[in-house]
Regions:
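Exposed, interaction-prone extracellular/peripheral surfaces
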Residues: 1-51, 57-71, 75, 84-120, ...
Length: 337
C-alpha cells in the first residue's frame, strides 16, 4: 500500500524545509544531542542487546540461555556436542547504515516527513556509536540507484554524511509517463551491505519496509531473506518509519491518492466509513506483516512515527535494550518487537 495524498502536506515546522542544509544540520545535531543527553556517552551495545562482535572461542550451548543463531557449527560437528560462539566487545565498532531514500519516504503529515525522520534516526545512531575510533559507513538507496559512503570514523565524517542526506534532491513527483526505470530494490541494497560489511558489527536499516510487500500476508517479503542473512553475521536494527496517514484515512471528502513509485492516481471518497475501516485494517495487517518479517529475520525492531516524539522512542528503546543486556543468564532476553 503505497498510495499517498496528492497534495503536499504542510509540516509542523514549516521553516525547517526553508533552511540551508548547514543550518538544518546544526539544528538536527542540537536536537539529537538534547534529546539523547545521557545516552551519548554509553557503549554502542546500548542500541541492541547481547554481546559484542569479536569472536573469543566457543563453549557448550546452554538451552534456554543462548541464541541458536550463535551456534558454532564447525566445533559442534567436530565434538558432536552443541557449541556457541563466545564474543567480546570490540574496541572499535563498524556500523553500516542502509538508508531508504526511495519516493515512498518523501511523505509526511506531522512533525516531520518520513525522510527527515530517517535522517534524524541516522543522526541518533551516528552519535550513539561515535567515539573510540568507531567507524560508520552507509549505503543510500534512492531512485537513481545505490550510493555507497565508505566506513570512516570521526565527527566530521558523520556530519558530512548527514549533510549529504539533507541536501539530496527530493524523489518522486512522477506521473505515469515519466517514471524512471526500476533500479535496485531493498533486497538488492541489503545484499550490497552484506558484501561490504565483511567484519562482524552493527547494521542499521532505516526504511518504511514497503518495498515489494506481497498482498498475501502468508508470503514473506522479498527483502526478508536478505535481512536474515545479515542477521546471521551482524547485530541488525530495523528502524521502521511510518506516518499516521499511512495507517488511517481522515474523513475529508474527495482526495486524490498517488503512488509515489509509479505516478498512478486514484480518487477516493473518504466520507465512506466502510472504506476507511478497510483501509485501516489493510494498513494494520501490512505493518504486522513487516513486524513479523523483521522478527523472523533475527533483527531488532524499532518503529518510529512522524507524529510521535522520536527522541523519546529511541531513548526508551536504548534503555530497554540495556536492561536486556544486563539481565542475568537465563532471564528472558527477547528483542524489542
Amino acid at each position: 500500500m503505497r498510495w499517498r495524498e496528492a497534495t503536499t502536506p504542510t509540516p509542523a515546522d514549516p521553516g525547517l524545509a526553508d533552511l540551508t542544509p548547514d543550518r538544518r544540520l546544526r539544528r538536527l545535531e542540537l536536537t539529537v544531542t538534547r534529546r539523547l543527553d545521557g545516552l551519548l556517552h554509553g557503549q554502542y551495545r546500548g542500541l541492541l542487546p547481547g554481546p559484542g562482535s569479536e569472536p573469543a572461542g566457543s563453549r557448550e550451548y546452554r538451552p534456554g540461555e543462548d541464541e541458536v543463531r550463535r551456534m558454532d557449527w564447525a566445533v559442534t560437528a567436530r565434538t558432536t556436542v552443541p557449541h556457541v560462539r563466545e564474543v567480546d566487545a570490540d574496541r572499535e565498532l563498524t556500523t553500516w547504515l542502509l538508508v531508504d531514500a526511495s519516493p515512498s519516504m518523501e511523505y509526511g503529515t506531522a512533525e516531520l516527513d518520513k525522510r527527515e525522520l530517517a535522517v534524524a534516526a541516522v543522526a541518533a545512531v551516528g552519535f550513539l556509536t561515535a567515539g573510540l575510533g568507531n567507524r560508520l559507513g552507509a549505503q543510500v538507496l534512492g531512485p537513481d540507484g545505490l550510493r555507497r559512503h565508505p566506513a570512516r570514523s570521526g565527527r566530521t565524517h558523520l556530519l558530512g554524511l548527514l549533510r549529504t542526506l539533507l541536501a539530496a534532491p527530493r524523489a518522486g513527483g512522477y506521473d505515469e509517463t515519466d517514471v524512471p526505470p526500476a533500479g535496485p530494490d531493498l533486497a538488492d541494497a541489503l545484499d550490497a551491505v552484506h558484501r561490504v560489511a565483511t567484519r562482524r558489527g552493527l547494521v542499521v536499516v532505516v526504511s518504511d519496509f514497503l518495498d515489494g510487500l506481497p498482498d498475501d500476508p502468508a508470503q514473506e517479503p522479498p527483502w526478508e531473506r536478505a535481512l536474515r542473512r545479515l542477521a546471521v553475521r551482524h547485530q541488525v536494527l530495523a528502524v521502521e518509519i511510518t506516518d499516521p496517514r499511512e495507517l488511517e484515512l481522515p474523513d475529508v471528502g474527495l482526495i486524490t491518492l498517488v503512488d509515489p513509485e509509479t505516478g498512478r492516481r486514484r480518487e477516493v471518497w473518504t466520507g465512506d466509513e466502510r472504506l476507511r475501516e478497510r483501509y485501516a485494517a489493510a494498513a494494520a495487517a501490512q505493518r504486522e506483516q513487516v513486524r513479523q518479517a523483521v522478527r523472523r529475520s533475527g533483527a531488532t525492531h524499532l518503529p518510529l512515527r512522524t507524529d510521535r516524539d522520536w527522541g523519546a522512542d529511541i531513548v526508551r528503546h536504548v534503555r530497554a535494550q540495556r536492561r536486556l543486556a544486563a539481565a542475568p543468564a537465563g532471564a528472558n532476553r527477547g528483542g524489542a518487537a
